[in-house]
Structures are given as C-alpha cells and as structure tokens.
C-alpha cells in the first residue's frame, strides 16, 4: 500500500485546487524555497492521517483556512488516494480515497465519498499498520533536532511509546480506577448492612402494635366497603336508567332524524319543483304574451290583405268586362283583316300578271316605235342632207350624243339599283325587328307571369324566414327568462354555500378559480368537494369527516399552488388551503375485516388521479352503526369511526356527537351551486346559439328583401319597356309600308331606265348601220316595214291602253286594301292583342298571392288559438300543481318544525342527562377509587353487612374510627418495611460478594499487565538496539554504535549505573521501575576505541545518531509509507549520501516522501516535485530530476 495522489484546496497556503500525482511507490522528493509551502504540504498529509490536528477549535480551524487576497475561503479539504492492492485497508477495493474537510463550523471525514466518523478513520488507519504508539512514520521539521537534544529519560519514554506501553498504562489506570470504586462500594454496602440490621430490630417491636391496628382497620375497611358498594350500586342503577333513556332517545332521535332528513329532502324537492313550475309558468306566460302579440299583428295583416283582396277582385272584374269589349273589337278586326287579306290575296296574282303583261306590251311598243322612228329619220335625212358626208357627220355627232346618254343612263341605273338594294336591306331589318317585337309582345304575358311568380315565391320565403325568426325570438325570450331565474337560483345557492364557510375562504375559492382562468393553469382541479360523488346515505358522514377540508384546493403540484398564492397575496384575495398531488403521501391503512366497520372511501366516486387527495382526507375513517362500535374500532385499529348520523370517535379518543342541523348541508349546497352553474352555462350557450341563428335569419331575410326589391324593379322595368315596344311596332309597320311603296316606285323607275337604255342602244346600232350604208331613199323592204310597224304600233297601243285601264282598276283596289290593313286594321289589332289578358294576369297573380297569404294567416291564427288554448290549460294545470305543492310544503314544514322542536328538546334532555351521567360517573369513579384504596379486603367484607342497614353501618364506622385514633402513631408499614429491609439485606450481601470477586480479578489483571509491559519494553529495546547498531554501521562503516539501557542499582536507588545490554546475551530480569533512561554511545573512527556519549558529539554527528534511531524505530515498527521533512538539513556533507542511500534502500519496501535542499537525496529519488509560491498561493508541480538538481545546486 502507498499514496498515489494528494489533492489540496483551501488549506493554508494552498488556495487553489492542487493535485500531486502520480507519486512513486518508492522514493519521492519535494524541493522548494523556504516559505514556499513544503511544510504546509506535509501538514496537509498529517491533517488527513490524524497525526496532528486531532481536536480543533473554531480558531484553529480558521487558522488552517487560506488567508490571502481575493475571495475569503470558507472551507478547505485534503484528499489522499491510497493504492490498496494488498488490501491493507479492509474495504475490498483496489483504491481508497480518504478526505478531510473543515470549515468554520464543520470538521468531517469521508471515505470513498461516504461520510465517516473520526473514530472509524483512526481504526481504519491502525488496521493498515499506522500505529498511534509510533508516530515516527511522519518526521516533521524539528523532530530530528528534538530527538538529538533529548535526555536519556526522554529516549526511554520514546521507547515506551514505541513499545505500546501507553496502552498498558491506560488499561492499568482503568483497572485501578475500577478497583477504587469497588472498595468504595464495599464500604458503602457495609454501612448499609449495619443500618438495616438496626432497623430490623426496631421493626420487630412495631409489628405487635400493627397486628391490633390491622384487626380494627380491617373492620373499618369492611364497613367502608359496604357503604361505597351500596352507593356504587345505586349509581349504577341510576346510570342504567339514564342509559336506557339515552338509548330510547337515540332511537327516537334516529327515527325522527331519518324522517326529518327524508322530509327535508322532500321539501327541497318540492321547493325545486315549485321553482321549476314557476319557471315553466313564467315561460308559458311569456309564450302566451308572444302568441297574443302575434295574433294581434297577424289580424292586422289579415285585415289589410282582405281589403287588398277586395280591391283586386273589383279590379279584375272591371278588367274582365273591359277585356270582353276588347275581345269583341278584336274579333271584328280579325274578321275584317281576314276578309281584306283574302281579297288582297285574290287580287295580287291578277295584279302581278297584268303588270307583267303591261310591261311586256310597253316594251314591245317602245321597240316598235324606235324602229319606226329610225326608219322615218333615215327617210328624212335624204331630204335633210345633201351629201353623204354631211349625213355621216351628223350621224357621228348623234352617236356621240347617244353614247353620252347611254353612259348617263347606265349611271342612273346603277344608282337606282344601289338605292333599291339599300331599301331592300332596310326593309329586311325592319321586318326582322317587327317580328322580334311581335314575338316579344306575344311572350310578355309569360314573362309577366314569371316575374309575378318570382315575387310571390320571394314573399313566401321571406314570410317563412320571418316566422322562423319570430320562433327564435320567442325562444330567445324564454332563454333570457330561464337565465334570469337560474341566475337567481345560483345566487341563492352561492349565498347558502357561503354561510357554511368563513368569508375569507369563500373569497379565496372564487379568486382561485378566476386566477386559474386568467393564468390558463391546466394543473388547477378545483375544491376537493367538486372532485367526488357520494351516496346521500353517507352525505352526513362525509361532511363530518372532511369538515373544512371539503374546500381545500387540489392542484397538480406545488409550483401551481405557488403561482396562485403569489397572486392571492398580491391581490389580498382571501385565504385558501392547497393540496398539491405531488406532495401528498397518504399512509397505507389496514381496515378491520368486519361487517360493522366499512371504509368510508369505498363509497366515494372519483377520478383515480385524485386518489392521493381523497385518501388524505377519508382513508382513515370507517363507517360504523353506532358511536360505541366506532369508539371500539378507533381504540383497537387507530382509525376514526363515524356513524351515518355524523357522530364521530377519533383515534385519540375524542367523541363528537349531538344535534346536527341537516338543513345546512355543505355537500347539498355545493351540489346545488354546481347544478345551477351547469344549467347557467348550458342556457348561456343555448342563448348564444339562438342569437347566432337569429343573426343568420336576419341576414337571410335581408337577402330576401334585396331579392324582392330586385324582382319588383324588374317588373317595373318590364312594364316600362312594354309601351315603347307597342309604339315601335306601329312606327315600324308604317315605315315598312312606306318603304315597300318606295321600293315599288324605284323598281318602276329602274325598269324605265333599262327600257330607255335599250332604246338608246338600238338607236346607236341603227345609226351605225346607216353610217355604213349609202345615202339613198328607203328601199321597198324598209317602206313595207315602216307600214307594218305603224299598224303593229297602233294595235299594240289599243291593247296596252285596255290593259292599263284594267291594271289601274286592280292597282287602286290593291292599294286601298293594303292601306286599310297597314294603316288601320293592323295598327288597331296588335295593341289590343298585347293589352288583352296582361292586366288580368297581373291582378289575378297578385290576388292569388293575397289569397295564399290570407290562407296562411288563417292557419297561423288557428295554430295560435290552439296554442294559446293549450298554454292556458297548461298554466291552469301548473297553477293547480303549484297550489297543491305549496299546501304540501306548508304541511311538511309545519311537521318539520314540530319534529325539529322535538329533536331539539330531546337534545337538551340528552345534554342534561349527559351532564348528570358525567356527575354520576365521577361519583362512581370516586367510589371505585375509594374501594380500590381499601386494598385487598377479607372475604367477610362482601357478605358481613349485606343485611345491615346503612344507618347501623355508619354508626359502627364512627366507633371504629374513634378506636383507630388511639393507633394514630403506629407504623402502618412495619410488615412491609420489615420485608423490604430483609430483601435489601440479602441483596447487599450478594452484591458485596460479587464486588469481592471482581476485586480479585482486577488485581490479577493488574499483575498480568505489569508483566506484559515489562516484556514489551525489553523486547522493543532489543529490536531497536539491534537495528540501531546495524543501521549505524551502514551509515558509518568505520565506526560502531549502540543503545544502552540505564537502570537503578539494587543497593542504591539514587546511583545510576550503566549496564550494557548486549543483544547476544540474555537480558537481566528486573522491574521496569528500575529503568531510568536510554543513552547512545557511538564511535565514528574505530570499532575498538572507547565509545563516546551522544552529548560529546558534534551537531552533525548528533543528527546522524538521531536519524539512525528513527530508522531503527521504523524498521522495528514499519509503516506503509514514511514522510521526512528536511531530515538531512543538519547533517555533515559526508553523511548525507549515506542517509540518502539508506532511504533508497528502505524505500524498496515502504514509500518515502521527503523534502530536501541537498542534492544527495535528489540523486537517489524516483519522482520529483517542485513547490512554487506566487501571490501568497502555493502550487505543486511534477518536475524532472534535472530541474530538481538545478534547484538544489543553484
């Protein structure tokens, strides 16, 4: 085992966290300047190993804490880690960590991070080989010097300490102390025995007087027993009578209470029913009032519609008469039009044929005339011109003129054709428009019907929506009335609940709910009373058990409770008690396995997540049939017992019973408040839903009104558009006729232009033909042709005139017929056709709509009448029910008053009886105590005075008491004292014998301890002396050294003799008291020269001898590790190497940690550490051998 790591923080100069690792299991050297903290490092190790700093005061602990600039250090610790591969520490671990921590108010140890006591640490170190009797495994500065300057007697004490004689001395001192105490106890026992013997002799004399006293005293006790017994029996009889009265009263009270509760529940139900009936009656009144208002409004509307229907009927009747007249006129017109159209249809073929024939004749006549004129011109030019040249010149001029006329005629023909085509297109457009107007006028009736039907449909939809909205208005009024009623009920219930608790609690509960809603706390569950349900049979028991705990607020954890409490304190909102579920730890309860003790909690219904809160309040309560049974179980099972009537016996023995006002039930009040809150919330939700529907119907009705307005505007627009169409038809009809006439005229003009063009072309051809001929007289053919042409022209002219006359006659009739039709008959017929039926359709449609509305109103009125009749019947029935229930309520309340008075009277009687019973029980207890005070009575006491009167007993008791006065000074405890003293004497004799044997055992133990101490000192001296000689030879090969035990001479105690004790010769047997000291004798130059005493040596030689003695002690009692603080400081140069070599040799089996300023120790070390000091803070770092050598040599 060895130290592997040391951690220091806050200890002396080591302020910061300092780790020294890894430490070699052999030789470790620490170097550093003076004052850097090397000694503090060793002090830290001693601090942990309890070699020093065992009992520290506050000031001493303060001195060990680091003091320097910066923050104040309030605690410090040193931690040492041991390699435990050899299991010298019996922990079963390969590594052991020991830490000691100090502060201003603490000083504690920890082993492997577990707190342990100082005694456990000391025992652990001793089990690993750290002996308290040998502190030389740690050698601090100054110890070598003190050992060097020590006297022989001090070295002897050191040897005793190493040998462990202190343990023997402690045990011997303890034995001597016990021996002294034993002697003192024996002496005291002897004194007590002497006193007891004297007292026994005195008591022997007092026993005779006591016998006479006992005889008379027994008589007295018998008489007193007779008196007390009779009084006890009388009290029991009275108590039995009172108990019977109490049981009878309780049974009567239970019956009355049960009936009272049932009647009270019935009263509450009747009140609730009356309230509900009043609510229903109020709703019926509101509905009846609404029905009356609806009836009045519908009647007003019905009267208005009836007036409108009458007006419309008259209008339709008048319209029908007017329409009949118009139909007759239309019929006559249609007849005339048909006649004229038939006549015109007969004339038109003749007219067209004769026009065609006249045109053909006219064309033929014109051609013949042109031919004739051409021949005559040709004949006249013979006389007109003298030469052919003049003629040709004239012909050419005529041709030019004719060509100009032809071109002009063609242009005129094209212009006429263009005008004709334009007129034809215009005619087609007007005819098309005329047809459209006629079709439109024909379809106006259907369109009018559609518009009227649409308006009627919209009105019906609006009326249906209005009716539904009215129903919703009625429903809204009912809901408002119900909400007001429920709000009143809720207010009354809250007031009733408020009377069951103080104002602060009531305010607090309301505030907590509001705060939880504001903060949106999901962990708020509400008061305990709202988290469970219970059967009405156990309601009283639950209230009596929970008390004010019913109003405790249940939350999920203490954080939620803290949040709410902060707001409550800030707003001063009341007082509440919280039950955080995460902090509740209800204990498991074992219930009795019996049918008359049932756990109250099993009759509660609740969410499992509230199990802890419910158990916290109700788990320790059982329901019992009577208070007596409850009391028995309360005592036997440490549970709270309760009856169904609320009588309670808790586990501490307290009883709670008596009259209870069942009308002020907290659970009922809570239930009512919760019920009305739910009703209020439901009604509010229904009201919001109803208002939302009303708003929706308002929007729909508004949309219907918009649609109706649009439909009415469409109808008006249609009516406005109807008149212009009629006017336009008349106008188009006239324009069409005029246009047809113009076209006919244009056509005639075009025919004439074409004929003229043909004539001009013919003339041009004739002139061209004449231009190519000679200028001669007409040939015979031409003359013959001229004659023939004249005759044909005359014949055709006569025929043409006849045809023209006929055509003129036909054309005049045709024109007259067309004019009659277009300007008269058609114009009169079309408006009539449009007018007939249109007004009637409008009026009839409106009349039908009015009749439908009247029918609806009739139905509504019938429904309202029926509903009002039903409502009146319901109201009468409800009024009757209310009257019956009020009568029943009055009778029940009267009976309740009587029963309550009787219960209260019974309660007062019970209270008086209870007070009387308490007095009797006190007297009974007093009698029992007096009887007990009589002690054990003789057998005759129970029968001797049974038949004796009380007066005789009192007289005898008086005589006996007078006789006993003569024995007032007798020792009444003589027998008892005699027996007690006898027992004490026997006990003291046995104790004295026990002390004698103990004294002998202690004497033997003291002798053995003295012998073992002598043997331990002699054995240790031999071992240390031998090791000293061996080690000295190794350190000083040329010399020798030895330890010499000094003892007193047997003849003279004052003369010291030096007796050399050779380790090879047997030690002389002598007492340890003859030892006076240990001296050191050495020779540094020769093994044979006379040895010198240590006082004769130089300082360096003394230090070497002291170190040799330390090494000898360490070899004799080796430790797992050794700590040397500058042990070579005072050595001469020639011995430092020897000491370093010795340390190196011993470090093979034991770890060494040394501080030094000398290079010899550094040269043989394994690990090196440097201590630095900066700003009053020490640190330790691992360094190389070269750095260590450089430091000690520099």
Swiss-Prot record:
Designated gene of the protein: psm3
Any idea what this protein is called? Answer: Structural maintenance of chromosomes protein 3
Question: Can you give the residue ranges of the SMC hinge domain?
Answer: 522-634
- Asked if Cytoplasm is a keyword of the record, the answer is no
Comment field on protein domains: The flexible SMC hinge domain, which separates the large intramolecular coiled coil regions, allows the heterotypic interaction with the corresponding domain of psm1, forming a V-shaped heterodimer. The two heads of the heterodimer are then connected by different ends of the cleavable rad21 protein, forming a ring structure.
Record note on quaternary structure: Cohesin complexes are composed of the psm1/smc1 and psm3/smc3 heterodimer attached via their SMC hinge domain, rad21/scc1 which link them, and psc3/scc3, which interacts with rad21. Associates with sor1.
Q: Which UniProt keywords apply?
A: Acetylation, ATP-binding, Cell cycle, Cell division, Chromosome, Coiled coil, Mitosis, Nucleotide-binding, Nucleus
The residues listed in the UniProt record as binding ATP, with positions renumbered to this chain, are 32-39
Gene3D superfamilies reported in the protein's UniProt record: 1.20.1060.20, 3.30.70.1620, P-loop containing nucleotide triphosphate hydrolases
Q: Which GO terms describe its molecular function?
A: ATP binding; ATP hydrolysis activity; DNA binding
Iron-sulfur: present as a keyword of the record? Answer: no
GO biological processes: cell division; chromatin looping; homologous chromosome orientation in meiotic metaphase I; mitotic sister chromatid cohesion
What the entry lists under Pfam families is as follows: SMC_hinge, SMC_N
Reproduce the UniProt comment on modification after translation: Acetylation at Lys-105 and Lys-106 by ECO1 is important for genome stability and S phase sister chromatid cohesion.
Compartment(s) of residence = Nucleus; Chromosome
Q: Which residues form a coiled coil?
A: 176-497, 668-908, 970-1006
* Listed InterPro entries: P-loop_NTPase, RecF/RecN/SMC_N, SMC, SMC3_ABC_euk, SMC_hinge, SMC_hinge_sf
Tell me which family the UniProt entry assigns to this protein: Belongs to the SMC family. SMC3 subfamily.
GO annotation, cellular component aspect: chromosome; cohesin complex; condensed chromosome, centromeric region; cytosol; meiotic cohesin complex; mitotic cohesin complex; nucleus
Species in which this protein is naturally found: Schizosaccharomyces pombe (strain 972 / ATCC 24843)
Sites where N6-acetyllysine occurs are at 105-106
> What CDD domains does the entry give?
ABC_SMC3_euk (cd03272)
What job does the chain carry out?
A: Involved in chromosome cohesion during cell cycle and in DNA repair. Central component of cohesin complex. The cohesin complex is required for the cohesion of sister chromatids after DNA replication. The cohesin complex apparently forms a large proteinaceous ring within which sister chromatids can be trapped. At anaphase, the complex is cleaved and dissociates from chromatin, allowing sister chromatids to segregate.
């Amino acid at each position: 085992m060895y130290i592997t790591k040391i951690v220091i923080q806050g200890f002396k100069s080591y302020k910061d966290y300092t780790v020294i690792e890894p430490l070699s299991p052999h030789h470790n050297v620490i170097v550093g300047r003076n004052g850097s903290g090397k000694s503090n490092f060793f002090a830290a190790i001693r601090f942990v190993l309890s070699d020093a700093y065992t009992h520290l005061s506050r000031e001493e602990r303060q001195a060990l804490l680091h003091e320097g600039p910066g923050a104040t250090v309030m605690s410090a610790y040193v931690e040492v880690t041991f390699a435990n591969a050899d299991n010298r520490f019996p922990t079963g671990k390969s590594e052991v960590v020991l830490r000691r921590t100090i502060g201003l108010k603490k000083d504690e140890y920890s082993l492997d991070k577990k707190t342990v006591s100082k005694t456990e640490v000391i025992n652990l170190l001793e089990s690993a080989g750290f002996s308290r009797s040998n502190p030389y495994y740690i050698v601090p500065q100054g110890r070598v010097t003190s050992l060097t300057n020590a006297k022989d007697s001090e070295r002897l004490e050191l040897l005793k300490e190493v040998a462990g004689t202190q343990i023997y001395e402690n045990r011997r001192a303890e034995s001597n102390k016990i021996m002294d105490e034993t002697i003192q106890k024996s002496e005291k026992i002897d004194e007590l025995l002497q006193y007891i013997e004297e007292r026994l002799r005195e008591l022997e004399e007092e026993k005779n007087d006591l016998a006479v006293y006992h005889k008379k005293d027994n008589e007295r006790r018998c008489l007193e027993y007779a008196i007390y017994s009779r009084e006890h029996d009388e009290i029991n009889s009275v108590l039995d009578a009172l108990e019977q009265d109490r049981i009878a009263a309780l049974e009567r009270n239970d019956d009355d209470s049960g009936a009272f509760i049932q009647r009270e529940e019935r009263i509450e139900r009747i009140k609730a029913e009356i309230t509900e009936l009043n609510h229903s009656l109020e709703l019926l009144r509101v509905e009846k009032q609404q029905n009356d208002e609806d009836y009045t409004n519908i009647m007003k509307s019905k009267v208005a519609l009836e007036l409108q229907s009458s007006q419309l009927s008259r209008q339709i009747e008048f319209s029908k008469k007017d329409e009949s007249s118009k139909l007759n006129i239309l019929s006559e017109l249609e007849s005339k039009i048909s006649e004229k159209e038939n006549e015109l249809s007969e004339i038109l073929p003749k007219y067209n044929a004769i026009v065609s024939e006249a045109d053909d004749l006219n064309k033929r006549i014109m051609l013949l005339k042109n031919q004739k004129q051409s021949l005559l011109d040709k004949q006249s030019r013979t006389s007109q011109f003298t030469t052919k040249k003049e003629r040709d010149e004239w012909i050419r001029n005529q041709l030019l003129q004719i060509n100009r006329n032809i071109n002009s005629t063609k242009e005129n023909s094209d212009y006429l054709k263009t005008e004709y085509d334009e007129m034809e297109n215009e005619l087609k457009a007007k005819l098309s428009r005329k047809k459209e107007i006629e079709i439109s006028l024909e379809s106006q009736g259907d369109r009018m019907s559609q518009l009227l039907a649409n308006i009627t449909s919209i009105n019906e939809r609006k009326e249906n929506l209005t009716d539904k909205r009215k129903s919703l208005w009625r429903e809204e009024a009912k809901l408002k009335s119900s909400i007001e009623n429920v709000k009143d009920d809720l207010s009354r219930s809250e007031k009733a609940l408020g009377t069951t608790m103080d104002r602060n609690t009531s305010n607090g509960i309301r505030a907590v709910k509001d705060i939880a809603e504001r903060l949106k706390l999901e962990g708020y569950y509400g008061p305990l009373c709202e988290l469970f349900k219970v059967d009405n049979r156990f309601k009283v028991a639950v209230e009596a058990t929970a008390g004010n705990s019913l109003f405790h607020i249940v939350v999920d954890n203490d954080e939620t409770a803290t949040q709410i409490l902060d707001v409550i304190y800030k707003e001063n909102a009341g007082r509440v008690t919280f039950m955080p579920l995460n902090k509740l730890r209800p204990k498991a309860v074992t219930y009795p396995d019996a049918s008359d003790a049932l756990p109250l909690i099993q009759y509660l219904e609740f969410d499992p997540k509230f199990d802890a809160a419910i158990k916290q309040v109700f788990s320790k309560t059982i329901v019992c049939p009577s208070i007596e049974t409850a009391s028995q179980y309360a005592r036997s099972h440490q549970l709270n017992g309760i009856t169904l009537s609320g009588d309670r016996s808790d586990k501490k023995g307290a009883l709670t019973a008596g009259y209870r006002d069942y009308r002020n039930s907290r659970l009922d009040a809570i239930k009512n408040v919760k019920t009305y809150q739910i009703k209020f919330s439901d009604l509010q939700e229904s009201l919001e839903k109803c208002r939302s529907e009303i708003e929706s119907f308002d929007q729909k009705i508004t949309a219907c009104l918009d649609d109706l307005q649009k439909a009415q505007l469409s109808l008006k627009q249609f009516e406005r558009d109807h008149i212009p169409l009629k006017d336009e038809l008349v106008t188009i009809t006239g324009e069409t006729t005029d246009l047809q006439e113009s076209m006919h005229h244009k056509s005639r003009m075009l025919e004439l232009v074409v004929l003229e063009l043909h004539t001009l072309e013919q003339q041009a051809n004739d002139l061209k033909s004449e231009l190519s001929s000679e200028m001669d007289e007409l040939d015979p053919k031409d003359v013959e042709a001229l004659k023939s042409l004249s005759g044909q022209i005359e014949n055709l002219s006569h025929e043409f005139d006849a045809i023209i006359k006929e055509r003129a006659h036909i054309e005049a009739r045709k024109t007259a017929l067309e004019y009659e039709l277009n300007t008269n008959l058609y114009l009169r017929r079309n408006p009539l056709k449009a007018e007939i039926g249109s007004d009637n359709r409008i009026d009839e449609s409106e009349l039908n709509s009015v009749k439908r509305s009247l029918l609806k109103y009739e139905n509504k009125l019938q429904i309202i009448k029926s509903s009002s009749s039903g409502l009146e019947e319901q109201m009468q029935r409800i009024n009757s029910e209310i009257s019956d229930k009020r009568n029943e309520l009055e009778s029940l309340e009267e009976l309740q008053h009587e029963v309550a008075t009787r219960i209260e009277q019974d309660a007062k009687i019970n209270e008086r009886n209870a007070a009387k019973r308490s007095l009797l029980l006190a007297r009974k207890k007093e009698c029992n105590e007096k009887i007990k005070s009589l002690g054990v009575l003789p057998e005759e006491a129970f029968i001797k005075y049974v038949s004796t009167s009380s007066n005789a007993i009192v007289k005898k008791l008086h005589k006996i008491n007078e006789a006993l006065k003569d024995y007032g000074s007798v020792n009444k405890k003589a027998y008892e004292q005699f027996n007690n003293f006898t027992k004490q004497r026997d006990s003291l004799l046995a104790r004295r014998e026990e002390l004698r044997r103990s004294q002998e055992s202690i004497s033997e133990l003291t002798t053995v301890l003295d012998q073992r101490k002598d043997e331990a000192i002699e054995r240790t001296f031999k071992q240390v002396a031998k090791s000293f000689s061996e080690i000295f030879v190794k350190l000083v090969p040329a010399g020798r050294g030895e330890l010499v035990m000094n003892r007193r001479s047997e003849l003279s105690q004052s003369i010291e003799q030096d007796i050399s004790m050779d380790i090879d010769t047997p030690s002389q047997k002598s007492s340890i008291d003859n030892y006076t000291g240990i001296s050191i004798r050495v020779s540094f130059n020769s093994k044979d020269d006379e040895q010198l005493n240590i006082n004769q040596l130089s300082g360096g030689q003394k230090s070497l001898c002291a170190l040799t003695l330390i090494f000898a002690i360490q070899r004799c009692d080796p430790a797992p590790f050794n700590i040397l603080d500058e042990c070579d400081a005072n050595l001469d140069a020639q011995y430092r190497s020897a000491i370093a070599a010795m340390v190196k040799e011993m470090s093979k089996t034991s770890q060494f940690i040394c501080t030094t300023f000398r290079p010899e120790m550094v040269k043989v070390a394994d690990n090196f550490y440097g201590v630095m000091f900066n700003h009053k803070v020490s640190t330790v770092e691992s360094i190389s051998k070269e750095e260590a050598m450089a430091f000690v040599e520099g």
